[in-house]
Amino acid sequence: MNALELKYGCNPNQKPSRVFMRDGSDLPFAVLNGKPGYINLLDALNSWQLVKELKTATGLPAAASFKHVSPAGAAVGMPLSDVDKKIYFVDPAAELTPIACAYIRARGVDRLCSYGDWAALSDTCDAATASYLKDEVSDGIIAPGYTDEALEILKTKKMGNYNVVQIDPDYLPAATEHKDVFGITFEQGRNDLVIDKDMLTNIVSENKDLPENAKIDMIVALITLKYTQSNSVCYVKDGQAIGVGAGQQSRIHCTRLAGQKADNWYLRQHPKVLALQFVDDIRRPDRDNAIDVYTSDEYEDVLADGVWQNTFKVRPEVLTAEEKKAWIATQTGVTVGSDAFFPFGDNVERARKSGVTYIAEPGGSIRDDHVIATADKYGMVLAFTGARLFHH
């Protein structure tokens, strides 16, 4: 099949709509269940490239959680700690595979943004991954294969209408790609830039101690950015993107947005948050929203008399601004990547507040000396990759 008819395009008024192969060849994917839409397939094909490249670059199973053609999260398949299992709502007795861990971590970083996500897996979807996904609100999934048990589990989602797409893992697109805007065709070479450890050798900071785990984190950050709407900045810890700032017009706003998301992720591990006692019948999305509000400056919205009883068994103590600041200050060893150069040292200053020790960015600003000096002030490791990663 070289074409797939869709219900509509980006919006219901945009008809007709389809995806097809210009050269008349067969589509490199098959729809195993459901009826994916235009934006679903944009998410699917962008997210597949991300996880495929992550797997190639790190040798680890990789997963992503996409919304509106940008990743809400991405991660490689490292084991979950007991705290991870608690904040990601994982059954302590569940048997987890590496690919399941990768998706749980990818989705867990920003659970509000991942509500109704598109999931992407570098490896075959197994029953462990499907079982976790079954209880989450999600629009669809793309993977190179599915076990029989996993497919049966996924087919029960959304009253049997959950979108399941299988991609040919060996498919390679043409070297040149096209896009029509206002009736005009744009042509460019596909972004086939390989991101690997060789890109991280130009360390321009005084501190040149870049351990292997930080190299993996830099690779995760850069590949995530390669498939994030620009401008974009990504914070990573232990192979997991913990904050993605996408589609901002200024670099510092990207750095702030991604940093705030990284802070929110870390605040969910605060002892007061871990001790929250939720009512027995609370839904996962309601629990996610409650945690998000509780850790924000709007905490009274869930703690007011007559309100907290809907969510908690016991009224929680306020997580004060001082407690939040002190907790975030304990975060260390974080990596930040940027899809274009940092024009000023203020980006480094903001990144430091979220525990950043390692920075990967292209370099090339007329103020590179100021950026380097700011990194040196805090003993950070700064690598200039020489590669811009804009994505539109």
Predicted regions: what is each one?
Residues 70, 125, 237-240, 342, ...:
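Active-site-proximal loop/turn and secondary-structure-junction residues that shape catalytic pockets
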Residues 57-58, 111-114, 226-227, 328-331, ...:
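A structural signal for short secondary-structure junctions
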Residues 72-111, 242-344:
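Glycine- and Gly-Pro-enriched alpha-helical subdomains that act as flexible
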Residues 175-210, 268-280, 284-291, 301:
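Substrate-contacting helices/loops that form the catalytic groove of nucleic-acid
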Residues 53, 227, 264-268, 353, ...:
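Conserved helix-loop functional segments at active or binding sites
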Residues 57-65, 164-167, 230-237, 267-278, ...:
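Flexible, glycine/charged-enriched surface loops at secondary-structure junctions
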Residues 117, 121-122, 135-165, 170-172, ...:
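C-terminal binding/interaction regions
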Residues 1-199, 214-232:
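Active-site loops and adjacent core secondary-structure elements that bind or stabilize anionic groups
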